[in-house]
Structure formats: structure tokens, C-alpha cells
A protein has these predicted regions:
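Alpha-helical structural elements
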Residues: 1, 51, 85-87
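N-terminal trafficking/processing presequences and adjacent post-cleavage segments
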Residues: 1-46
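Generic detector of leucine side chains in alpha-helical contexts
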Residues: 8, 14-15, 39, 51, ...
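Residue-level signal for the start and early helices of compact helical domains
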Residues: 38, 47, 81-85
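Short secondary-structure junctions
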Residues: 49-58
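Short, compact, well-ordered microdomains
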Residues: 59-99
Length: 99
């Protein structure tokens, strides 16, 4: 099952995405060009959909240029229900949004 279908099945939200799970640059979530004007919202919706519990806060966001690709690297703090806090990183290939 691809990542778009996984999120649709779990949340009922259809995001304009493809590609990987966002855990690394090599597995970046590809955001389609039709999301250009709501890029941040799509990224935030994806992060929320991937977290099973608690809430999160964005710590940093960086636009990274790598050859002909553009990536958003987002670092968050994930506040778990048991009181623990995890730092997590999500990668998004936003190249299509800059064409």
C-alpha cells in the first residue's frame, strides 16, 4: 500500500503526495505541484497522520537544495501521552512545487 492510500485509509484525508514515508531524504514524501499554495498545510497534515498519539510542535524547517531537487526537512518534538518527548525528522521532496 502506498503512503497516500495509507493516510486515506487511516484518516479519511486524501493528500496530494506520493513517494516514501518521509523518514529520510532517500524516502522523502513527494508533494505534487497542485499543492503549491498549501504546501505547509499538506506537510502538517502528513505529520499529524503519521503520529499515533499525543501532539507535536515544529522545531525547525529547512529548505535543502540537492542537485536538481528541493527538500523540506522538518524537525518536530512529538509529545507522547505518557509524558515522553521524542525528536523526529520528516523529509519532503517539494521540487514540483517550485517548477
Amino acid at each position: 500500500m502506498d503512503i497516500q492510500q495509507y493516510i486515506l485509509n487511516n484518516t479519511g484525508v486524501l493528500l496530494p503526495i506520493s513517494g516514501g514515508n518521509g523518514k529520510s531524504q532517500d524516502q522523502a514524501v513527494v508533494i505534487a505541484s497542485k499543492a503549491t499554495y498549501r504546501l505547509i498545510q499538506v506537510e502538517d497534515d502528513f505529520i499529524s497522520a503519521m503520529l499515533d498519539e499525543g501532539y507535536w510542535k515544529k522545531i525547525s524547517q529547512s529548505l535543502i537544495f540537492d542537485d536538481d531537487k528541493k527538500y523540506d526537512k522538518i524537525t518536530i518534538h512529538h509529545f507522547l501521552d505518557n509524558g515522553d518527548v521524542e525528536q523526529r525528522v520528516f523529509w519532503f521532496d517539494v521540487t514540483e512545487c517550485f517548477l
